[in-house]
UniProtKB/Swiss-Prot annotation:
The gene is rpmB. Gene3D superfamilies: Ribosomal protein L28/L24. SUPFAM superfamilies: L28p-like (SSF143800). InterPro entries: Ribosomal_bL28, Ribosomal_bL28/bL31-like_sf, Ribosomal_bL28_bact-type, Ribosomal_bL28_sf. HAMAP family: Ribosomal_bL28. GO terms for biological process: translation. This is Large ribosomal subunit protein bL28. Belongs to the bacterial ribosomal protein bL28 family. One of its GO terms (cellular component) is cytosolic large ribosomal subunit. GO terms for molecular function: structural constituent of ribosome.
Length: 97
């Protein structure tokens, strides 16, 4: 299981832990990942993702899970999220047309 957000592609960063005497030792800054179940209103189904808490705020800000996926870049999404995005686009196109 990778330590990468499936919606925003946040990944671990590398830096230094600096002591009072300025001795630097390598450390990793890990993203705050949580397992969340999102409900797609368009598909009428629920989907589980491992996302950062930053992504949770972004989903709320953009008006829900479906709206977030439709506005998100494919380069940031996981393959599972891209497939879901395509399904939502097809369903909305069929509904509109």
């Amino acid at each position: 299981m990778s330590r990468r957000c499936e919606l925003t592609a946040k990944a671990p960063l590398v830096g230094h832990k600096v002591s009072h005497s300025n001795i630097k030792t390598k450390r990793r800054f890990l993203p705050n990942l949580v397992n969340v179940t999102f409900v797609s209103e368009t598909l009428s189904s629920s989907v589980r993702f491992r996302v950062s808490t930053h992504a949770l705020r972004s989903v709320d800000h953009r008006g829900g899970f479906d709206a977030f996926l439709l506005k998100a870049r494919d380069s940031e999404l996981s393959p599972k999220a891209i497939e879901l995005k395509r399904q939502i686009q097809k369903k909305q196109a069929a509904k509109a047309g």
